[in-house]
Amino acid sequence: MVGRLSLQDVPELVDAKKKGDGVLDSPDSGLPPSPSPSHWGLAAGGGGGERAAAPGTLEPDAAAATPAAPSPASLPLAPGCALRLCPLSFGEGVEFDPLPPKEVRYTSLVKYDSERHFIDDVQLPLGLAVASCSQTVTCVPNGTWRNYKAEVRFEPRHRPTRFLSTTIVYPKYPKAVYTTTLDYNCRKTLRRFLSSVELEAAELPGSDDLSDEC
C-alpha cells in the first residue's frame, strides 16, 4: 500500500526524488518502490534540528541498553521450510514550514473486507473549513499491495508541519486497517519526508510455494 498526501501550493519535498532507490524495490518483494530507511535516517540526523522520536520507538540510549531480539532469519529452520519477508507495517512523515497557530487533524480509516469500504473523519478547530477532500483506494486482485491516494485542501490553507501514516498488514488475514493522521507541531521548523517499511520473517512450507499469501 502506498500513502501520499497532496496539498496545493506546497513546495517539492527535499530530496524526495533522490530517495527512490531502496532495498525493497525488487519486483519480487511485492511492494511498490519506497525510500530505504537508511536514507531517511541519515537525512533526519543531518537536518540541523532535533526530531521527536516516533511513537513506539526507543531513544538511542535506551535502544543501546536494550538487548536485541534474535532475528527470525538467524533461527534454525525445519527441513522443507523457507523464510519470506512479509509487510508488517508501513509509516511515513512529512514536516513543513511555516507553522500554524492551532492544530489541524485529518484522520482517514480504510478497511478492506468482502465489501470494500473506507471511513473518513476530519477534525478541525473553529474558524477552519475543508475546501475539498478526495480519496481513492485501488485494490489489486491477487496482489500483495494496494494503492492509496488522498488529497485534502484546507481553508485557510495552512501548510502541515507533520504528516504521519501507518499501515498494518495482518498475515494470512484478508483485512487491513489504514490510519492516517495530519497534525501540527509548533516546535518543529524543518521540512522532511520520512518513509519506512517494517518487515518480519514468515516461515512457508517449501520454497516452491511462495504465493502471495501475506
From Swiss-Prot:
One of its GO terms (biological process) is negative regulation of bone mineralization involved in bone maturation. GO terms for molecular function: filamin binding. Residues 1-56 are annotated as: Disordered. Keywords: Cytoplasm, Cytoskeleton, Phosphoprotein. The modification Phosphoserine is found at residues 6, 26. It is found in: Cytoplasm, Cytoskeleton. GO terms for cellular component: actin filament bundle; cytoplasm. Its main location: cytoplasm. InterPro entries: Refilin. It comes from the Eukaryota. PANTHER family: PTHR31848, REFILIN-B (PTHR31848:SF2). Belongs to the Refilin family. Interacts with FLNA and FLNB. Involved in the regulation of the perinuclear actin network and nuclear shape through interaction with filamins. Plays an essential role in the formation of cartilaginous skeletal elements. This is Refilin-B. It comes from Homo sapiens.
